[in-house]
Amino acid sequence: MEVAAKLKYARISAQKARLVADQVRGLGAEQAVNLLRFSNKKAAALMKKVLDSAIANAEHNEGADIDELKVSTVMVDEGPSARRFHARARGRANQILKRTCHITVKVSDSQVEND
């Protein structure tokens, strides 16, 4: 059984969020939560909320045992970018991109399903 949780339009660049995603991919759920709790990165706090939601979904909707859950998939996709302008000298302007991303976390129990 695989259960997912998503956070869309997170106000962080996908490149920065992927650094944290690579750390938790494949870990046990409890170990991943502990790693994210003590990380100093902004993406870690966002990823922890999504992981907690996925764990709660697995427990409530599927009746899964929390101790057997592991992080099977973590995807960070680019979202739309908001454009802002930064005033420069001599009447010019530069563009600033406020990037967003979509974070998807899937947790699964260690059992393999047979169809």
Swiss-Prot record:
Keyword set includes DNA-binding: no
GO MF annotation list: rRNA binding; structural constituent of ribosome
Function: This protein binds specifically to 23S rRNA; its binding is stimulated by other ribosomal proteins, e.g. L4, L17, and L20. It is important during the early stages of 50S assembly. It makes multiple contacts with different domains of the 23S rRNA in the assembled 50S subunit and ribosome.
GO cellular component, one term: cytosolic large ribosomal subunit
Key words of the record: Ribonucleoprotein, Ribosomal protein, RNA-binding, rRNA-binding
SUPFAM superfamilies membership: Ribosomal protein L22
Gene Ontology biological process terms from the UniProt entry: translation
Family classification: Belongs to the universal ribosomal protein uL22 family.
InterPro entries listed in its UniProt record: Ribosomal_uL22 (IPR001063), Ribosomal_uL22_bac/chlpt-type (IPR005727), Ribosomal_uL22_bac/org-type (IPR047867), Ribosomal_uL22_CS (IPR018260), Ribosomal_uL22_sf (IPR036394)
Name this polypeptide is given: Large ribosomal subunit protein uL22
Pfam families given in the database record: Ribosomal_L22 (PF00237)
Complex and partners: Part of the 50S ribosomal subunit.
The organism of origin for this protein: Coxiella burnetii (strain RSA 493 / Nine Mile phase I)
Keyword Ribosomal protein assigned: yes
